A protein has these predicted regions:
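Glycine/proline-rich, positively charged
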Residues: 39, 87-135
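Active-site mouth loops of central-metabolism enzymes
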Residues: 20-33, 80-91, 119-123
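Generic beta-strand or strand-like secondary-structure segments
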Residues: 61-64, 80, 91-98
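Short alpha-helix boundary/capping motifs
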Residues: 69-70, 78, 127-128
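A short, structured active-site edge motif that brings together acidic residues
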Residues: 73-85, 111-116
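Acidic active-site catalytic centers that drive phospho-/nucleotidyl reactions
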Residues: 50, 80, 106-109
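N-terminal binding-site loop/beta-alpha segment at the start of enzyme catalytic domains
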Residues: 1-75
Length: 135
């Protein structure tokens, strides 16, 4: 696996693992199959896993797999703020706290804005205090 360093010098695999579409049965992620996929990627050198609040159980699944296999401190997790669900600062804080709970961690490595495509949306988030919250 090839790696690039982030701005803090942390090596990040050039291939990340997107966690949007795990196979499901009866609306639930097929745990054993998806866990094998995550572990195979990790064994191949992948250390960057991308999930999101709206990815249908993905955060909970990833948190469980990393906890069960002792991987949390060995990987980097990116998840996303669903800005379209945010109405105020309390919504930002509540959503982030829920993501931490789902991921079974007290931090995420990279927190992204999900589908932020225009200046108007960014201005709305700024009016809720997102810049101060990020700092």
């Amino acid at each position: 696996m090839q790696y690039r360093n982030d701005k803090y010098g942390n090596p990040i695999s050039v291939l990340g693992f997107g966690c949007m579409r795990f196979d499901k049965k009866g609306g639930k992620i097929e745990f054993e199959k998806a866990e094998k996929e995550i572990l195979a990627a990790y064994e191949a050198g992948v250390n960057y896993y991308d999930t999101a609040y709206i990815y249908g159980g993905s955060e909970e699944f990833l948190g469980e797999v990393f906890e069960k296999n002792g991987l949390r401190d060995k990987v980097k997790i990116a998840t996303k703020l669903p800005h379209y669900l945010i109405k105020n600062m309390e919504g930002i804080e509540k959503t982030f706290a829920e993501e931490l709970r789902r991921l079974r961690t007290d931090y995420v490595d990279y927190y992204l804005m999900h589908m932020l495509t225009d200046v108007k949306t960014w201005e709305r988030l700024k009016s809720h205090g997102i810049e101060e919250w990020i700092r």
